[in-house]
Amino acid sequence: MESVLGRGSMGTVWAATDEVLHRPVAIKQVNVPPGLSAGEVARLRERTMREARAVAALCSPYVVTVFDVLTPDAGPVIVMELFRGRSLADVIRDVGRLTDGQAATVGVAVASALRAAHAAGITHRDVKPANVLIGVDGGIKLTDFGVARSSAEPTITGTGMILGSAAYLAPEVATGTPVGPLSDAWSLGGLLFACVEGRPPFDRGTPIATVASVVKDPVPAHPHAGRLGRVISGLLLKTPSLRMRLDRALPIMRTVADDPSGTHLTTSPENPSSRPDHPDRLHA
């Protein structure tokens, strides 16, 4: 291992070199929080192994590749692709709003990654701008498939645990309905909303207030959505059975992204995603 890329409440990431294949990699060690019972530790290891193996089986250019996973006593270790760029959250923070063409380019990548995951029986559960990487070459990757999430970023999972980001939480998840692909579709709608409006659709300052708003409040207007307006509106329908599905949203987004007026989205090499902008944001 060569250098520490970032430390967070759930683990540490290093840059390293695979000495067999001579390629750069990122290595994440998932911490075992103190105070857990033996059963809780076993479940943490089992969940990490199961999800890391599932992500490793995905064949998508839009997913950060997992090469290997190990289980030493100190905590699970995940060997993964080293992808240089910035998070979409940081791009939005710096530029304010993306064009509809740029947002559609992101949407195509994220939706494609989600379709590959859903086909493999995986639901992401935490789609948000902080979990999307924009590469220095314009490549886009979806990260954090539940391998290691920080409890400092609240979301409600199907088990009732609070993990992730409430601002992009599907309303049915907040009310206890099991998580599924349509929940990821809602979160993609929230992500696209943030791209074109510069803020999430629901954010009331605290996780509890935000979750209540997701469940009860109407979806805010999105006047800057442009040609993505019907996609965002369709993905953010609160009734899952009425919500736009990814296979319907993708062709629309491709048309918008392929339009010459859509600016190619890149990030500067001075801000590599391998060095997290936030200590708790560990890309994997």
Over which residues does each language-model region extend?
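C-terminal or otherwise distal, non-catalytic regulatory regions appended to signaling enzyme catalytic cores
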Residues: 273-284
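Eukaryotic protein kinase
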Residues: 1-269
